[in-house]
């Protein structure tokens, strides 16, 4: 594991990235040919021994194969593999026919020898000049770097064939970046050539045979290869766990992508970590005899990708549908109220249109309902009441008075004497009449009219201040806990004291009317008295504001105000 992490760390360090792609490509070639990586060779102090194995391998394979350049062309034309399979099915992987592997190795060795002597590359390219001087941190000498650069040019055709697919989900794109698409096994059988192994089992046995260890090792011992394979498998298991975490925790995808970005870049650039992990999974499978699910995912990721992509899409689409089904199942049916419940609720609505939470809870306990249902009933009841109000305002033209208990003979009766209550609200009507009578009694100089409303005598001149004093101060904006301070600041209005007396006096005058209404509980009598008087004032003020707006006396913005 330590060597594996040293390789990745070296490929991720900025000085390694800033050198050039030649070192990275040499890293690819050395790993594909089965030798130790340049980082390990530098750590072991054997950086100067690179050209000797290259030359020895070149001589051996020239003796075996003849002309190396003639064999490199068909190999390049045949082998279009992603980086993950280059070690499985590439040269030295033991998965192709031994002749094909030797031909591939001969092609790479010939490229290295040609660049070492200064000739052109495999595709007729002029190799780049070697680096000037090797620093102590260099992974190999200049001749090795130039050889690797020219040999990497032979693999450019492989890189062209790896266009990224269009990903459906982010988790699928992560898996595609980490483990590229693997062609199905029949296509791999065709790649092995006319004399290739026919079945995957035979190919596995050929890979685990005694002759595959030197081919995969490429000059190193079989024990070193076993250690490398075990380390690679552990590293790949960690990557698989990270991928599973990505699939399970989609909310953390962005953060995980940022954390994995340099690591994924190094894997995509070198192409050896994934390839070594795939080879490790194959080797463990040949030793153990059967594949674990994670290793099957490594060898056949196209099946897993198809399933994973479909599952992720179905889950993302199905989660919404499942939530929708749950919501549909949990849909609340309409509450059916009994006649007793409706009677009690209507009685409470007569007392106040806006009951507080304590009143609602008490009603809910008495009527065997929930507080939420009581609140919704009051909302609906208020909406119905507003609708009736609008319908009543449209049926009466603005100049004619509303039908009410008070006399309509006075000119201001449409504004002060109108009663918004339907006939089944006697308690509130009587409360408002009693309040008006009490306010009139507070001013003996102003004799009350026959309807006992607080109005100046008909012979007195009706100024605008008198009208506004009666109407504006009964608007909902002025019915607030601070109305006493407000009245004290508005002395120029002649009827301000009249309105203040009207708002101060109703509680003692209303006691008889409210007590006569069907209230059996004496504990809530005071609260109900206050609620009924405030409700009466609110309703009267709302209707006065509507009337004044129709006559363009007050601005239109004050029509829809309600005090909650």
Swiss-Prot record:
InterPro entries documented for this protein: HD (IPR001356), Homeobox_CS (IPR017970), Homeodomain-like_sf (IPR009057), OAR_dom (IPR003654), Paired_Homeobox_TFs (IPR050649)
Biased composition (Low complexity): 111-124, 143-154, 205-215
Species in which this protein is naturally found: Mus musculus
Gene that this polypeptide is encoded by: Arx
Keyword tags: Developmental protein, Differentiation, DNA-binding, Homeobox, Neurogenesis, Nucleus, Transcription, Transcription regulation
Protein name as annotated: Homeobox protein ARX
Cleavable signal peptide: none
UniProt feature, compositional bias: Polar residues: 159-171
Residue spans of biased composition, Pro residues class: 125-134
UniProt key word Transcription: yes
Organism superkingdom: Eukaryota
Taxonomic lineage: Eukaryota, Metazoa, Chordata, Craniata, Vertebrata
Biased composition (Acidic residues): 222-252
Any one Gene Ontology cellular component term annotated for this protein: nucleus
Location of this chain's protein in the cell: Nucleus
Residue ranges: DNA binding: 330-389
Start-end of Basic and acidic residues biased regions: 253-264
